[in-house]
């Protein structure tokens, strides 16, 4: 079943539950560990976080921001804005919540890829941490672990730091007030903002949070005004392509936005006016309906690593979800060999424009 996403305007929030104060895994969680769909290559930052917890037990209940499944962490309330990872957490038996509320004796945090997202997460964690509580942050050395450890230690007392797996997990306490200037600066970063010279709202951590993606802008230039009927925007982000389609193509009866990042989808709801529906959804699992036209700027990275298979999965879903005579409109980096994959799916690709960086393709 596809869950239609509705969000309040706080990009990082979830509600507390009662959990045992012991760090040990309960029998229920042991069963969950056996059936966990955790990938073979576990996130090294997650492994380092679990190691830090074994070496430095903390009080519970706990909240896990940026959660991923791990047997030592199944007792934590999980917040995860990315649908594929949220689905893994749910399959492992973790309690998921859309908006964290209340206070937790411990908060665990696996930051995202950007500095702004990480610092915004610091202030969120502070606001959800009970007096005397512990915040543990874990990230890769190449993602700036040492820099962020230094940054947060200026605001709060550093408890410990554990280095392993080319990552670092470090902890601060809430036994005394944090530095107010640092909190104010981080809180400002966490606020929704407008992309310069536009009316589009974004938040830290979403794709293309500081500007309109040039690939999407190029695709928008090639959307024919004759587009009509039911349209899907897969990997819709904060809604730029859907907004362009509704503005340029008056005969669109409805556009459905499918996006894996709940924060981006919340932005899209603010950015669009018109006949649109919004779905927090993993596109690689398929779509619930067929469409006259599908728009996409498919992702080709999983985390920091290039993953052309992800782009292929998007195109496969699109091909299966087109009505007879329907058309796929996409933009991609010019070096990605998508044409052959489209042909293998029974579509006839046509390159409409190719620049030094991008290519726009129509396939039917």
Description of each model-found segment:
Residues 157-193, 333-364:
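Class I S-adenosyl-L-methionine
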Residues 294-319:
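Mobile active-site "lid"/loop adjacent to the S-adenosyl-L-methionine
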Residues 81, 140, 257-261, 310, ...:
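Short beta->alpha hinge that forms the Motif I/post-I loop of the SAM-binding pocket
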Residues 132-141, 325-332:
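Conserved beta-strand signature within the Rossmann-like core of class I S-adenosyl-L-methionine
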């Amino acid at each position: 079943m596809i869950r239609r996403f509705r969000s309040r305007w706080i990009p990082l929030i979830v509600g507390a539950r009662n959990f045992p104060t012991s760090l040990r895994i309960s029998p229920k969680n042991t069963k969950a560990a056996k059936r966990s769909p955790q990938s073979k290559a576990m996130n090294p930052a997650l492994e380092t976080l679990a190691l830090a917890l074994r070496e430095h037990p903390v009080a519970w209940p706990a909240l896990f921001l940026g959660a991923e499944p791990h047997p030592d962490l199944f007792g934590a309330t999980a917040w995860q804005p990315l649908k594929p990872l949220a689905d893994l957490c749910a399959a492992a038996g973790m309690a998921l919540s859309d908006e964290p509320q209340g206070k937790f004796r411990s908060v665990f945090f696996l930051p995202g890829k950007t500095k702004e997202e990480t610092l915004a997460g610091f202030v969120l964690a502070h606001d959800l941490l009970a007096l005397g509580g512990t915040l543990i942050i874990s990230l890769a050395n190449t993602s700036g672990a040492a820099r962020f450890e230094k940054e947060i230690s200026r605001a709060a007392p550093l408890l410990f730091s554990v280095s392993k797996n080319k990552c670092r997990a470090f902890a601060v306490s809430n036994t005394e007030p944090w530095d107010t200037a640092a909190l104010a600066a981080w809180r400002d970063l966490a606020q929704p903002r407008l992309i310069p010279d536009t009316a589009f709202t974004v938040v830290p951590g979403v794709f293309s949070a500081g500007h309109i993606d040039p690939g999407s802008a190029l695709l928008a230039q090639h959307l024919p005004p004759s587009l009509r009927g039911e349209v899907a925007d897969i990997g819709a982000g904060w809604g730029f392509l859907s907004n362009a389609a509704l503005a340029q193509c008056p005969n669109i009866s409805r556009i459905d936005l499918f996006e894996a990042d709940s924060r981006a989808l919340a932005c899209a709801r603010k950015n669009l006016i018109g006949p649109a529906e919004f779905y927090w959804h993993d596109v690689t699992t398929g779509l619930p309906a067929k469409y006259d036209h599908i728009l996409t700027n498919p992702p080709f990275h999983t985390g920091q690593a290039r993953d052309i298979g992800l782009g292929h999965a998007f195109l496969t879903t699109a091909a299966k979800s087109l009505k007879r005579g329907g058309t796929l409109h996409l933009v991609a980096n010019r070096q990605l060999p998508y044409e052959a994959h489209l042909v293998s799916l029974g579509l006839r690709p046509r390159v409409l424009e190719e620049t030094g960086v991008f290519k726009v393709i129509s396939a039917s």
